Amino acid sequence: MKKKFLALALSLVMALSLAACGGSQEEAPAEEGGETPAVEEDGSDVITVGFAQVGHESDWRTASTKSAQDVFSAENGYELAFVDCDNDSAKQLEAVRNFIQQGVDYIIIDPIVSTGWDAVLTECEDAGIPVIVIDRTIDDSDKYVSWVGSDFKVEGLACGEWLKAYAADKGITEINALVIEGSTGASATIGRTEGFKEIADREGWNILASQTGDFTEAGGQEVMESYCQSYAGQFNVVICQNDNEAAGAMTAMDNAGVTYGVGGDVILVSFDANKPYVQMVMEGKINANFECNPMAAPTVAEIIQQLEAGETPEKEIYVTESWFAAEDNVATITVNGEEQPMVHVTQEVLDARPY
């Protein structure tokens, strides 16, 4: 009966979460760098969950946090201990160890970096607390129950395949690209970089430079300002590995008098596809945006229900994602032998976006 109640409640809250988790950072109820109180055991059948979140560096992260707080609510039979780790790996390890001491039932980790997890995951195992990893990946895959997230390399490959088709349609014969990477060591950075570089190497494109913007608007602006000085007049593509970096890059290019987007001198590509940036695609400011779905929490709740029922969940679960374009000249792309649609952004498409 409890499982049926949880399933019904979760279906309702997912609808509310999808409607409410758009890109503004003001929407997340947790304070920046903050945490929720420790869980308290009261002998009830409430499921206690600890969530060690990366931080609050982007609109995507805000949507991810909001989704978890909506799903793992008291109304749904959960008590959530949430820690914003502020992009501090040591703080994240400490948060997980605190969850162990609190005796939570489950631990969710969105890892800041992929390495250095063996010891603390062993401690989770010894305490009998299942760990579920979301978004970014962890190298010690035998020490957690399930991972839920995106195929970051496929995102990078999709970006490259779209750029190839778009350039061919526009008669662009030479690609000179600048890349603003995400946080160093993050699996999203690694996957998107590897995927795009694979296509760039295959096509003989010139990647002029690739530097980290740390997934932040300030970082994206700083790197792009440097690029505009060092590579003035030499580049025709800018790849930003998340939306916030793209916002910073646009500010830098505006200040430098560089035009971008549809009809501009520079093709601008982003990742994440938060709703405000999908609107920028519709407006032609961003040429293409490759979604990274932040809504892992409902799937994590399903995994927890499976574990509560004594079932074995899948080890890897990929969330559904879409690719968005400002123009309709490239209808489909082929990624790893699979034909995938490019969604031409219209007002109807934008209105349907949940975040």
Predicted regions and their residues:
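Short beta-strand elements at the ligand-binding edges of bilobed clamshell
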Residues: 82-84, 139-165, 210, 283-294
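Hydrophobic alpha-helical
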Residues: 97-101, 106-126, 196, 209, ...
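Flexible loop/hinge segments that line or gate small-molecule binding clefts
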Residues: 115-154, 176, 274-282
